[in-house]
Amino acid sequence: LRRQDSLADSWWKQKVKVGRRIYSTSSWEEFVSDPSQLEFDYYGAIKKIEAVLGKENIIIRRFGKQYFKNGSIYEDFMEALGVRYDSRFVISEGKRNNSLFGNSHEIKRILNMLNMNKHDRLFFKRIVREISDNHTDLKGETMFSAEEARQFMEKYREGNRKLMQEYFGKDEDL
């Protein structure tokens, strides 16, 4: 489970970055006012799954480096499967899903509105990547202000707290 504000932020940025998909031309304000493509009511969704599969047959884990086993999503995933992670597992250094930083998303969103051929799209994609690479200091920035994130998360607080109590035995927010 990823905090809903973090999921919304990440999902919109990914759609804009990739382009030519739903929301790839929507402003952040448009998306966040009606993010109907995502299931943010985790408690309700998990209860539906639980009703079909049984609580004992589902694994609920928190998403975030601070929650991953040894800070590794790979190790955490293997642990969830019941597989011991060791040196036999080699993580390739191949192509990664690199993030954009700073205002690169807004530039890319505007470019997504233009009718371009593949060559031009790739040309501008490289330019946006270069702009972003020069602003890695903005890596932790999100589209929400602190107050906006608080308000957004408030909608899901009750369900999130139930999840934390039922699945993690904790009396805290997600």
Where are these regions (language model features)?
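Anion-recognition interface
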Residues: 1-174
